Amino acid sequence: MKNNLAIKFIAILVMSYLSCGSANASCDDAPIDGVDYSNCQFSEGQDLSRTYIPNSNLSFVSFIKVIFDKSIMMNSILINGNFAESSFFRANLYEANLEGGNFEKSNVTSANLTRANFKGASLIEATFKDSNLFESDFTGANILNANFEGANLNNAIWIDGKKCNLGSIGKCIK
């Protein structure tokens, strides 16, 4: 009987240990791979340059005027986040989901946004100069006065849901 209880206790400990392996974080925790900052509010104007947070959940967060220059954020979820006036200069957002996000007046110059999802995002006056937007999806996004000078838009899905042809550098050619 005691052995049976001991085995159950050890099994519970092992299961508890295994279930604690995720990278869920409170809003005060340091950024790491796979961190979950969903619904957090952060101070404006922070410098988070060179932050390494791939595979992270940043949905519904507020990062206004935050600097993410040269950060690694590939495969991260940034849906419905507020990144207004933030900087992503040379950031890697490969296959990131930015659906419904606010990136108004953000600097996304020379960034890797290959296969990024911008569906329904507000990109008003955002700058994507010289960025790689290959196969990104802009369906329903607001791109009023956005700057795509020198940006690779090859095979991107444009705001009207139509695919940009090869040779779409700086503007979508359909």
For each feature predicted by the language model, list its residue ranges.
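Detector for methionine-enriched segments
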Residues: 1, 15, 73-74
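Bacterial N-terminal signal peptides that target proteins for export
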Residues: 1-10
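Bacterial N-terminal signal peptides
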Residues: 10-20
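Tandem repeat scaffolds
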Residues: 23-174
